[in-house]
Amino acid sequence: IMGGLERLATGIYISVASTVDMGGWTMTSGQLRFCRRAVRDANFRGAPVDATIQQWKSIRRGETLYIDPFRHNAAFTIDSYLPYETCILMNLLDGTMAQHAEAMRGAGLDGVLRAAGQFAQIDYLPYIPESSVLHEFIG
């Protein structure tokens, strides 16, 4: 595919690998990735949260088929999770999740639904560096 250049390339796999301890239960890395995806889809693709929920099983299937088998080839793996992002993403999603509770449960997103409303509202924008990867999702 790369015309022999693969020997000169360095593979890097970047994704959320962390989980969040919610005091008795855990938000998984997949649930955290859903939060990122839902906020980004709403902000940059004009897609409502329910559209992202409907696509989520297909997205996860694509990861399983086309990403997971190859990520072990990466020379470096980077966990892109930021400790403060859950609070920000959950605040942005909070008003819409209860409306889609049944669909979220059906998509395996119970943890995201359970986390709704558990985070304090904060004025976060002044504290996020301009170069932060979080801007890819929140704008």
Residue ranges and their predicted role:
Residues I1-G139:
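Conserved NTP phosphate-binding and transfer environment spanning the P-loop NTPase/kinase superfamily
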